[in-house]
Amino acid sequence: MTAMHVALGDSVRFGKTVGETDVYMFAGVTGDFSGNHVDEVYMKKSKYGQRIAHGALMVGYMSTASTMMIDRALAKGLDSTPVSLGYDRVRFLAPVFFGDSIRVTYTISEIDRDRQRSRAKVEVHNQHGDLVAVAEHILKWVPDKPGEAAA
């Protein structure tokens, strides 16, 4: 059976200050130039009073935390290649503003050895400790070809 090298409760954290450049680069890559993200004048008139980062950018930061967990497992030597099956129950609970410092916590919450999957609880907090985004992430630990274990 494929070794997953993760255990219930294993956790990693990733932190970043979300800047204007991050948001504009994300808008450029995705084509999402919504006024919510790039139009300062428009957003000053809104309830928020300022531009907000894309929710999907927060999912990108969740992916960074997932990669950190995978890298930790790879360092132990694997006979599988972990791949993302996706995110469930993604919710954006509060806005993330330019200049906010976010902290993503990625914690293994379930292991299904028969299906070679792990599930993680993912939480994103801002610098004030407010929960701004949540999700569940599913990893599939795909067995390598015999004799071709991951480095």
What are these regions (language model features)?
Residues 31-32, 43, 71-72, 77-79, ...:
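Short, charged/polar low-complexity linear motifs in solvent-exposed/disordered segments
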Residues 1-11, 92-151:
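HotDog/MaoC-like acyl-thioester-processing domains
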Residues 1-53, 127, 143:
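Catalytic strand-loop segment that frames the active site of acyl-thioester-processing enzymes
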Residues 50, 63-103:
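Hydrophobic beta-strand-centered segment that forms part of the acyl-chain substrate-binding groove
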